[in-house]
Regions:
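Extracytoplasmic gate region of multi-pass secondary transporters
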Residues: 33-34, 209-251, 255-261
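Helix-breaking motifs and short loop linkers at transmembrane-helix boundaries and internal kinks
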Residues: 45, 77, 98-103, 132, ...
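Conserved MFS/SLC helix-loop-helix module at the cytosolic interface between two early adjacent transmembrane helices
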Residues: 64-103
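Helix-to-loop junctions at the C-terminal end of transmembrane segments
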Residues: 65-77, 260-273
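Cytoplasmic helix-loop-helix junction between adjacent transmembrane helices
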Residues: 108-144
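Intracellular juxtamembrane helix-capping segments at the cytosolic ends
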Residues: 118-131, 313-327
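Helix-loop-helix hairpin linking two adjacent transmembrane segments in secondary transporters
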Residues: 133-134, 140-189
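A late C-terminal transmembrane helix in Major Facilitator Superfamily
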Residues: 329-364, 371
C-alpha cells in the first residue's frame, strides 16, 4: 500500500475500519470500573474519593493530552501518534492483570487516559480531511463505536469476574487494543500531509469567545458522562443491586449512547443548523437525570437509556459542530482539540463533585441535581450556535468565509453516500 492509499477508496475503507477499532477501545477502561467498585474496594480498601480518581484522572489527562496533540502533530505523523496511543491503551490495561494497590490501578488509568487523549486529538482532523463529505456520518460512527465499547466494558466485565479475578478481567481489555494496533501497522497508510504544520494564527483560537462556549458545552456533556460512569452502578449497588445487575444498567445507558451517537448526527446532517437536534439531546438528559433524582427505583432502565441517548447524541453533535466552524481541516482539528482539551479538564471535576456531594448528603441525588443545573446552562448556550454567524465569530477573512449553501450541500452529500 503506497502513501496515496489513504486518499483512495481502499485507503478510505482501511481508515474507516481503524476508526471503528479504535473507537471500541476508548471507553472500556472507564466503564468497567463502576460495576466492580465494591470488589475493588474490598481488596484494596479504596474509599470513594480514591475510586473517583479512576475516572477523574483519565478525563483530566485526556484534556491535557488533547491540548498537546496539535504541537505533537507538527513533529510527527498522525500514524505514529495513533500507534503510540494504542500502545499506551494496551499497556495501561495490561498493567491491571495483578493490581495489588490503588496506586497501580490509578497509574494504569493514567496511561489509558493519555492514549485516549492522543486518539481524540488526532482522529477528528483526519476524519474531516479524508471524509470531507461524510463528516457527520463518520464522526457518528466513531462516537457510536466509542460508546458501544463502553457498553461492552460495563456488561462483559462483571460477567468475566464470575470465572476470573476482577484484575484479570480488567486486563483482558488489552487484547482488542492489540487488534487495532495490528490493523494500523499492516493496513493503514496516511500521507505526511496529515501531520504538517498548522497554519499561522491558530494560536488565537483560544482567545475567541466561541471557543470557550464550545468548551463549556463539551465539559458539561462529559461531566455527565463521568458522573454516570463512576457512580451510576455504585448508586444502585448501595440499594441492594448486584454488580452484574448494576453493570447491565451502565450497559443499557451505553447502548442508548451508541444508537443516539450515530443516529442524531445523521438526522442533523441535512442542515448545518444542528440546534434543534442538540435541544432534543439535552431534553433527553433532563428527563433521564430528573428520573434518577426523583424516582430512581420506578424505571431505572428508562432513566439510564434517556441519559445515554442524550449524552451520546450531544457528544457526537458537539464534535460535528466544532468541525463545522472552520473549513480548513487542520484549523478545525485544532479547534476540536481545544474544545476537548479544556472541556475534558472541566468534565473531570464531575466525578469528584459527585463524591463530595455524596459525603455531604449521604446519597447520589445531589449529583444528579448538579448535572441538571449544568444542562440548563448548556441549553442557553446552544441557542448561540447559529451557523450563519460561524465566519464572524471565528474571525475568518472575507475571502475565506464559507457560504451556508456550500456547507449544506456538503452535509446533504453525507446523507446520500454510504461510508467508504
Amino acid at each position: 500500500m503506497n502513501q496515496r492509499n489513504a486518499d483512495q477508496p481502499a485507503g478510505h475503507t482501511a481508515l474507516l475500519v481503524l476508526v471503528i477499532l479504535i473507537g471500541l477501545n476508548l471507553r472500556p477502561f472507564l466503564t468497567a470500573i463502576g460495576p466492580l467498585a465494591q470488589a475493588i474496594d474490598q481488596r484494596l480498601a479504596l474509599g470513594m474519593d480514591t475510586l473517583a480518581w479512576l475516572t477523574l484522572l483519565p478525563l483530566w489527562l485526556i484534556g491535557i493530552g488533547v491540548l498537546l496533540t496539535p504541537s505533537l502533530r507538527r513533529r510527527t505523523s498522525a500514524r505514529q501518534l495513533l500507534g503510540l496511543a494504542l500502545l499506551l491503551l494496551g499497556i495501561g490495561s495490561a498493567m491491571r492483570f495483578d493490581a495489588q494497590s490503588g496506586a497501580l490501578l490509578i497509574a494504569s488509568a493514567a496511561l489509558c487516559g493519555l492514549g485516549s487523549a492522543l486518539v481524540q486529538g488526532v482522529l477528528p482532523a483526519l476524519i474531516k480531511q479524508h471524509f470531507a463529505r461524510k463528516v457527520p456520518l463518520v464522526m457518528g460512527i466513531f462516537s457510536a463505536c466509542m460508546m458501544g465499547g463502553g457498553a461492552l466494558g460495563a456488561s462483559l466485565t462483571p460477567r468475566l469476574v464470575a470465572s476470573l479475578d476482577w484484575s484479570r478481567a480488567l486486563a483482558l481489555w488489552s487484547l482488542p487494543v492489540l487488534l487495532a494496533l495490528v490493523w494500523l501497522v499492516w493496513q493503514v497508510r496516511l500521507p505526511r500531509a496529515a501531520a504538517v504544520a498548522i497554519l499561522h494564527g491558530e494560536q488565537r483560537l483560544i482567545t475567541l469567545p466561541r471557543s470557550w462556549l464550545l468548551i463549556v458545552c463539551f465539559g458539561i456533556i462529559n461531566s455527565g458522562y463521568g458522573i454516570v460512569v463512576a457512580w451510576l452502578a455504585p448508586a444502585y449497588m448501595a440499594n441492594g443491586w448486584s454488580a452484574a445487575q448494576a453493570g447491565e444498567l451502565v450497559a443499557w445507558l451505553a447502548l442508548a449512547q451508541t444508537a443516539s451517537g450515530l443516529g442524531l448526527p445523521l438526522l442533523a446532517a441535512r442542515s448545518l443548523d444542528r440546534r434543534r437536534w442538540m435541544g432534543l439531546a439535552i431534553a433527553m438528559q433532563l428527563a433521564g437525570f430528573g428520573g434518577l433524582w426523583l424516582a430512581p427505583a420506578s424505571a431505572p432502565i428508562l432513566w439510564c437509556m434517556l441519559c445515554g441517548a442524550g449524552l451520546g447524541g450531544s457528544f457526537s453533535l458537539i464534535m460535528v459542530i466544532a468541525l463545522d466552524h472552520l473549513p480548513d481541516p487542520r484549523r478545525a482539528g485544532t479547534l476540536s482539540a481545544l474544545m476537548q482539551g479544556f472541556g475534558f479538564m472541566l468534565a473531570a471535576t464531575g466525578p469528584w463533585v459527585a463524591a463530595w456531594l455524596y459525603h455531604l448528603f449521604g446519597d447520589f441525588a445531589a449529583a444528579w441535581q448538579w448535572q441538571l443545573g449544568g444542562l440548563l446552562l448548556m441549553s442557553l448556550l446552544v441557542l448561540r450556535l447559529d451557523p450563519r454567524h460561524y465566519p464572524r465569530v471565528m474571525g475568518l477573512p472575507t475571502a475565506s468565509k464559507p457560504t451556508l449553501s456550500a456547507h449544506l450541500s456538503t452535509s446533504a452529500a453525507a446523507q446520500s453516500n454510504t461510508p467508504a
